[in-house]
């Protein structure tokens, strides 16, 4: 009989049974079939193959993105095991991801999701799932509407990320837990709950929880909902379309390995390729290949794009800074929303969000500092289940701590460096190259970053993080 584990609602979830047949993709054709029994199907990183176990409990070992697994509905309890970041397809029950720094995301069914000895981000998504960290400092993600889950091995270094449940303080967490024998149940909302196996309330720590943004302590100080684009013109307008130090023709950041030139629409020789457009309250920044005529004006760079700053119009010390945007998913593009010191110095720098177009499941949140006398950076590469479409990206900057948010849910924290206590202004841009690499297709169809709004808030004087 197959091994089982009870989930948070008392339903037994099954592990795949022991295999009775074994198959390898090495030397196979494009399709590899199993038997009607329990199969182990081994991929090969050099073989482009779809493996089909068929009936029975099948276990698939995937070694690269060209190894694929397929199961029809009702064909046993099936498991995928891989070192890669992976989202479980339909008709699979269980997933193991062993690679450190990877994510393991479930599907809409009741899943058993397991990590490895390193650090993983584990999100069962829909269904009532059983989650197993299996060592390392893991992040467990729970979003409202995705059911009730159980963590079998929550430890001191693990993190729980709660999205949409309205918890804004650790005290609220403690007031909603109840001991059930050896287990601790956290009551969430709408009948959903999270169970910590073999845990008591006094073992929970505030640092283990990433909670929702408390908007009641915020007072709006800046807002642009982009019904029009208010470019600076003398002493009026909001946005500069170039760095404060750049000439009228614009510039780029060559030290970042960027392959685009940021076009200043007010510079006549390149005004024909204005990267900014506004439609229905959404600002679009477009990156595109540069024609030979334009290249002659922009130092030979291959691409054009746009950047905006509030250097001339707005800066603030501490507060909450937020952008709602639809990020591009094209290979080789690098969208960002960030803060720089109003006095023109660098570092420090506070990156609210950066992304690589080809990696839409990773939100990069970074703080740069010179507090030690040399440049240091704390980078958080946060795994999210779905960053397609519009989402909010924010950072809460206080005297003691910096907290990053994705859709109002905290995703990362860092201490505020000693050189980050002066006013900073906002920047938003769409770069090409740099950390995202070279576009695979030369951006033949262009790439678009769409921004619904950018806002800033101050904090109530008596509020503490």
Curated annotation (Swiss-Prot):
Keywords: Exopolysaccharide synthesis, Glycosidase, Hydrolase, Plasmid, Repeat, Secreted. The active site is at residues 349, 354. PROSITE patterns: GH16_2. Residues 206-462 form the GH16 domain. It is found in: Secreted. One of its GO terms (cellular component) is extracellular region. CDD domains: GH16_laminarinase_like (cd08023). Pfam families: Glyco_hydro_16, HemolysinCabind. It comes from the Bacteria. GO terms for molecular function: calcium ion binding; hydrolase activity, hydrolyzing O-glycosyl compounds. Its main location: secreted. Pathway: Glycan metabolism; exopolysaccharide biosynthesis. It is an enzyme of class 3 (hydrolase). Its EC number is 3.2.1.-. Gene3D superfamilies: 2.60.120.200, Serralysin-like metalloprotease, C-terminal. Hemolysin-type calcium-binding repeats lie at residues 33-50, 105-122, 123-140. InterPro entries: ConA-like_dom_sf (IPR013320), GH16 (IPR000757), Glycosyl_Hydrlase_16 (IPR050546), Hemolysn_Ca-bd (IPR001343), Serralysin-like_metalloprot_C (IPR011049). GO terms for biological process: polysaccharide biosynthetic process. The keyword tRNA-binding does not apply. PANTHER family: GLYCOSIDE HYDROLASE FAMILY 16 PROTEIN, GLYCOSYL HYDROLASE-RELATED. Cleaves high molecular weight succinoglycan to yield LMW succinoglycan. Dynamically regulates the molecular weight distribution of succinoglycan by cleaving nascent succinoglycan only during a limited period after its synthesis, perhaps before it undergoes a time-dependent change in its conformation or aggregation state. Belongs to the glycosyl hydrolase 16 family. This is Endo-1,3-1,4-beta-glycanase ExsH. The gene is exsH.
